[in-house]
Amino acid sequence: MKLLPSQTDEVSLAAFGEEARALLIRHDYSGLANQFGYALAYERAPSAAIEADFLSAAASPHKVASAAHQPIAVKYFAPNDTGLFALVECTVAVGEGAAVLLELIVTGKGEGKHITVEDISGVAA
């Protein structure tokens, strides 16, 4: 999703994280794919890839003290030549004391920035 120059601040990026998290909580995989795309879709349809990766992550979730609504974390990269600008981390509750991590990545140079679902992960087996 292409961002306006005014949408790269922490508040705006956190709002995109909330939107993505809400879509995932509702299991609206098509809506999430249509809005943000999916960097790790590879040869799969983005919505099917998001669903498969979410189900895989939910099968081995992160342990959390409270599965209640966690704040969105926005982290900015140091200036670089790779085009990486920011990371948006969203904890998504999948059960009592269990959550998966939904990550969105902001890439681009200058004013041309995009936000994309980067990964959905649980605990590595």
State where each predicted segment sits.
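Short amphipathic alpha-helical segments, especially helix-boundary/capping motifs
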Residues: 5-9, 29, 78-80
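Generic alpha-helical secondary structure signal
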Residues: 11-14, 18, 30, 48, ...
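Surface-exposed, charged secondary-structure patches
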Residues: 53-99
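Short, low-complexity N-terminal intrinsically disordered segments enriched in polar/charged residues
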Residues: 1-22
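Short beta-strand edge/turn micro-motifs at domain boundaries
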Residues: 93-125
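Short, well-ordered alpha-helical segments enriched in acidic and aromatic residues
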Residues: 26-39
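Short, charge-rich amphipathic alpha-helical segments embedded
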Residues: 40-57
